[in-house]
A protein has these predicted regions:
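Flexible loop residues that form catalytic
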Residues: 43, 69, 135
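Extended hydrophobic blocks
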Residues: 1-37, 47, 57, 73-74, ...
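Short internal beta-strands
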Residues: 63-71
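Nuclease catalytic cores that cleave nucleic-acid phosphodiester bonds
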Residues: 111
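Short, solvent-exposed loop/turn segments at secondary-structure boundaries
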Residues: 75-79
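Structural recognition of the beta-strand scaffold that forms the well-ordered cores
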Residues: 39-41, 65-66
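Histidine-anchored nucleotide/phosphate-binding helix
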Residues: 46-64
């Protein structure tokens, strides 16, 4: 999909984007069912941590698992890893430390799932069901990865934000931090999820997705 510049082209662009956004977020279930763990994919977004804490406080799961290695933003946030950052944010919301389990080595979605589940097993926490929490556009791939690696686990996906809210948040945060990312760059990152779903399915990392032809063409 080409990037548009003037307002008329921009409106046309966002209209064309809508099916892609709907496809990427159609797995979200709010509120999610009660599960054995809230499984959080590494991030440096405050709202992801806050939402995981909210689900815990609503008694939707007895544990929060956070998986995430170091990212570029960690240095700016005075955190060693994404998991470290998110744990600090969750503890601020008065979640008991012993209910937060961290995994610090995963550097991609596949590792998040494998290392996170291994960490839970090492602590003798049996997982039959999980609520997946991540940025909204990432959740479909998180779900597909989990289904491939642990097909026996019952899964649900949940997100604090709708896709529109997420996009607005990202652009506002970029302005506040004087980030050089443009609206187009944010959108390109999100649309790239379609390619990732195809590529990682071919590698055998995730469950193959039934992606409509119009979505592939639009992306």
């Amino acid at each position: 999909m080409g990037i548009k510049t003037n307002e008329a082209e921009k409106n046309e662009y966002f209209t064309a984007l809508k099916p892609i956004l709907n496809f990427l977020t159609d797995c979200i279930e709010n509120p999610p069912p009660k599960s054995d763990v809230i499984f959080v994919f590494g991030s440096t977004k405050h709202y992801v941590a806050e939402y995981a804490a909210k689900l815990y406080l609503e008694k939707l799961a007895p544990y929060i698992l956070i998986s995430g290695h170091k990212s570029e933003r960690c240095n700016n946030l005075y955190a060693k890893t994404e998991a470290d950052f998110m744990k600090k944010e969750i503890i601020k919301l008065e979640i008991p430390d012993e209910k937060i389990i961290t995994e610090y080595n995963a550097s991609n979605t596949l590792e998040n799932v494998i290392f996170g589940m291994r960490t839970l097993a090492d602590k003798n926490i049996k997982i039959n069901s999980a609520i997946l929490v991540a940025k909204p556009f990432h959740l479909k791939r998180c779900l597909a990865t989990f289904k491939k690696q642990f097909p026996q686990v019952k899964l649900s996906c949940s997100s604090k934000m709708t896709f529109t809210e997420y996009l607005s948040y990202e652009l506002t945060e970029n302005e506040k931090s004087k980030n050089n990312k443009t609206e187009n760059e944010v959108i390109k990152r999100i649309i790239g999820e379609i390619d990732r779903l195809i590529i990682y399915a071919e590698k055998g990392d995730i469950v193959k997705q039934d992606i409509p032809e119009n979505i592939i063409i639009a992306a």
